[in-house]
Amino acid sequence: MDFQSKKLINDPNDVVTEFIEGLIENYPGLQYLDGFPEVKVVLRADVSGAKYDKVAIISGGGSGHEPAHAGFVGEGMLTAAICGDVFASPNVDSILAGIRAVTGPMGCLLIVKNYTGDRLNFGLAAEQAKSEGYKVEMVIVGDDCALPPPRGIAGRRGLAGTLLVHKVAGAAAACGLPLADVAAEAKRASEMVGTMGVALSVCTSPGQVTSDRLGPGKMELGLGIHGEPGAAVADLQPVDVVVSHVLKEILSPETNYVPITRGSRVVLLINGLGATPLMELMIIAGKAVPELQLEHGLAVDRVYTGSFMTSLDMAGFSISVMKADQAILDRLDAPTKAPNWPVGAEGNRPPAKIPVPLPPSHSIKIEKTLSRPEKLSPQGHILETAIEAAATEVVNLRDNLNEWDNKVGDGDCGSTMFRGAVAILEDMKKYYPLNDPAETVNEIGASIGRVMGGTSGILYSIFCKAAYAKLKENAESVVTAIHWADALEAAIAAVSKYGGASAGYRTLLDALIPALSALKERLNAGDDPADAFIISAEAASAGAESTKHMQAQAGRSTYVPGDILASVPDPGAMAAAAWYRAAALAVKEKYNTA
């Protein structure tokens, strides 16, 4: 193991929960919900949701960016922070737990960085909370200025400028403003800020091998906070040159990302990405202020320098510039007890953790207990065979998926899919009602939702829920191949609807859509169902391989240059094709030996 991959940790799977426990020991004004490991929520110790008389400000996202977001929980800033696994969006249940814990009659505002997984998970949680009677608004922050105006649905990434939006919203809420006004101030603040980052090294996730993608003497402009590739790799330059370039990109009139012109008042935030010494950050600040004043004709009213939104151990920095007026300055100057704004840690220490709140009584459902049948029907045996083969194939493919994803994403596709597959294999032994295909599909979705973070987890949960609903429409006791095709069609439609992708976007749908087309064609032609599934599996594999030639239109791959995309297929599509093909082959073999 090389030096850069050394970590002061125990189990890589426990880093987020152990970080939260350490944070709470430092600051008596914070608590966490007693729901580890699925629920990882840090909240203000002085807030009780049902009695809280101000708008709650809630944010969060994947961990690995500390002190963001939990370090900015405190009076005058965030009311709660929802922590996902490292670089993975928090799950919907965790977000809902946070909403229920701190939201009173005034409602809550969710401030979400613009990443697909965060948008989907926070969006679904918001809709569920609304159905339970909570008032919820959501503001999405996309302050990235490094890349050209993006194509597709992904949009600009949320970066360190999000913290300035947190502060504005937190101060507005502390004044007692209603939810609509707080949301309006946050939205306006998000439109006033632009950010660009520069990395001298890529980050190393706990338990992962250090990437050598960024070599000696090189820097990467616009590298993402999850390690995804940026706008360009260049030779390392003196800091004066680098800062000048970054500010020109943020303030570029060609992209017009921020409404800042000569004579504007601005706020400057210099943010370390995790491994940059404070000395270097202060050097950057010392260059940036006169550059803004003399070269761009701006009045710099406030400067904040430190490591606020990091990327684990990445060496580098980001600069955020926000257009300011007196109203924004008043919000930024308002008092806060958020420990990493920073503020002191005075006050009595309450209990470190409190129970996870239950849903309101009117929405509590008495769910039936599901279990594995003592005796499997012929249909149950076939379903078990297909599930076991599909999940085992995903387990075996973990390293390949991670290798591909290291080039076009954040390198965790295989690990994420692996967690879901292992959970499916374990839960099937105890809980899956295999004689009931619809309920089994629903339970697969529950297994995935419990352990899989990020966009893959929520999309596969949506996939299973839609397939389950379609299968439940069937009144017959036996599910036929036509029923499975209809369920696959409904699942694909749901993923496309909520995820925003379709054929040609370089996603898992580029494997599943061809599979569905081939399956329906062969079944309509009267083919044997097992043979039809084999042919459709071949179509899935061909579709997945074809993603090498596609320009990404969804997810983090949107930000990756075309020459890198062309070197590997989409990991999500390859995973989908692999489990589909494994299931089809296993069912075919089962029929042949019957």
UniProtKB/Swiss-Prot annotation:
Domain DhaK positions: 11-341
Binding site for ATP: 410-413, 455-456, 499, 507-508, 570-572
Listed GO CC annotations: cytosol
UniProt keyword terms in alphabetical order: ATP-binding, Kinase, Nucleotide-binding, Transferase
Signal peptide: none
GO biological-process terms attached to the record: glycerol catabolic process
EC number(s) on file: 2.7.1.-
GO molecular function: ATP binding; glycerone kinase activity
Binding annotation for substrate: 62-65, 113, 118
Ranges of residues in domain DhaL: 381-585
Active site: 226 (tele-hemiaminal-histidine intermediate)
Coiled coil: none
Location of the region described as Disordered in the Swiss-Prot/TrEMBL record: 339-358
Family: Belongs to the dihydroxyacetone kinase (DAK) family.
PANTHER family with a match to the protein in the record: TRIOKINASE/FMN CYCLASE (PTHR28629), TRIOKINASE_FMN CYCLASE (PTHR28629:SF4)
Protein name listed in UniProt: Putative 3,4-dihydroxy-2-butanone kinase
Natural source organism: Solanum lycopersicum (Tomato)
Lineage of source species: Eukaryota, Viridiplantae, Streptophyta, Embryophyta, Tracheophyta
